[in-house]
């Protein structure tokens, strides 16, 4: 699977053969070239083509129905359009902090820090909050 972390200033791309098994990471500035050209460059740098792969893009911005706009970079993400142009079999576009929130339950108690009183309950709702291009927030 071709995976991408698209931030407001930097984008990171890699191939994942299975969950937790991520290969080399290719970085490039966000928005300096058209999106499709950037994806093609990343695939070339990773030594692969898109035709047999699924892709997931975690983007720094609001996502609705598989679409997102990075207004500061001039990139627009449309999962169906990217799949057709790049011949990916499947494309997912998701908010970057939503991706982090989805992974929180996998961390277990060793990978979390309790803030405030009470007992840590890994099954309880958890919050991700952090700076990036803007202020990212997500709940798991």
Predicted regions and their residues:
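Short amphipathic alpha-helical segments
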Residues: 15-16, 40, 68-70, 105-106, ...
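Short beta-strand-loop/turn "lid" adjacent to the catalytic site in phosphate-handling enzymes
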Residues: 48-93, 98-111, 128
